[in-house]
Amino acid sequence: MKHHRLAIVRQKYRPDGGAERFVSRALTALSNQNLELNVITREWQGEKQDDWHIHICDPRKWGRISRERGFAHAARALWQQQQFDIVQSHERIPGCDIYRAGDGVHRRWLLQRTRILPAWRAQMLMHDRYHRYVMNAEREM
C-alpha cells in the first residue's frame, strides 16, 4: 500500500509553543497511520522520532517581511519539489492544502486593535508594510 506523504509547515519549532505542541501531538498521533511524516521548518529544537523527516528551510532574513516572505517561498519550493500529497501549514503560505489559523485572521486582529488606538495610530497600523504583507498573504490563500 502506498504511503501518503504529509508535510507539516511551521517556520520555527520550539517545544514550548502552542502551535508546536499541536504539531508534536499530530506527528505522534499520525506516526502509526501509514503516512510518511515530514516537517518543513526553519529550525527544529524538539525531540523527533526516527520516522519523522525534518526538512530545514532557512533562507536569509533581514527583517520581518523578508523573514516571512523568504520562508514562504523556500517552503513552497521545497514542497513542490518533494511533491507531498498533503501540505498542512501553520504559516500564511498560498498553495498549502490546509491552513491552521492559530493566530486568527490578521486583518480582524488589526481591526480589533485599532478600536483602542488614537485615529492617527490606527491609520499607521493599518498601513504598516509588515501588516499589509500579512493581510495580502492571507488574501492570496
Residues covered by each model-derived region:
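Receiver (REC) domain switch-region micro-motif
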Residues: 6, 87, 99
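Short His-centered aromatic/hydrophobic patch
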Residues: 89-93, 101
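N-terminal strand-loop element at the rim of the active site
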Residues: 3, 10-16, 29-66
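Acceptor-binding helix/loop patch of EC 2.4 sugar-transfer enzymes
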Residues: 98-137, 141
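An amphipathic, basic-hydrophobic alpha-helix
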Residues: 61-87, 96, 131-137
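Conserved alpha-helical elements of sugar-nucleotide-dependent glycosyltransferases
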Residues: 18-25
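Flexible, active-site-proximal loop/turn residues at the rims of small-molecule/cofactor binding pockets
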Residues: 12-13, 93, 105
